Swiss-Prot record:
Keywords: Ribonucleoprotein, Ribosomal protein, RNA-binding, rRNA-binding
Family in the record: Belongs to the universal ribosomal protein uL14 family.
Residues forming coiled coils: none
UniProt-recorded Gene Ontology molecular function terms: large ribosomal subunit rRNA binding; structural constituent of ribosome
The protein, known as: Large ribosomal subunit protein uL14
Leader sequence segment: none
InterPro entries (UniProt xref): Ribosomal_uL14 (IPR000218), Ribosomal_uL14_bac-type (IPR005745), Ribosomal_uL14_CS (IPR019972), Ribosomal_uL14_sf (IPR036853)
BP terms from Gene Ontology: translation
Complexes and interactors: Part of the 50S ribosomal subunit. Forms a cluster with proteins L3 and L19. In the 70S ribosome, L14 and L19 interact and together make contacts with the 16S rRNA in bridges B5 and B8.
Amino acid sequence: MIQQQTYLNVADNSGARKLMCLRVLGTGNCRYGGIGDEIIAVVKDAIPNMPVKKSDVVKAVIVRTRHPLRRASGMTIRFDDNAAVIINNDGNPKGTRVFGPVARELRDKNYTKIVSLAPEVL
């Protein structure tokens, strides 16, 4: 569960390393975000000479959370970290690679480009 002020790792090669969530997008008064939800975030740590700079406000989609995710089959998935992928306004990732596993729920929310770039889908 991601809320305001939550720090997330960046799971792509866009140039950012750490994000801080400013707002969870979606339904009206949405306080918490889960896997597949879009957020507005600020870049807190970045790699020099890359397209995304420190203090840039970006849009991202959550791909991993430490909070357990319960599926309809009864299976529970929990990742080791909170991570997001930076996207543009069209919903496509800014980076060309995605690091680490991502959840299958991203495919249901039409983030097929992120799923296809990921090395492992759980």
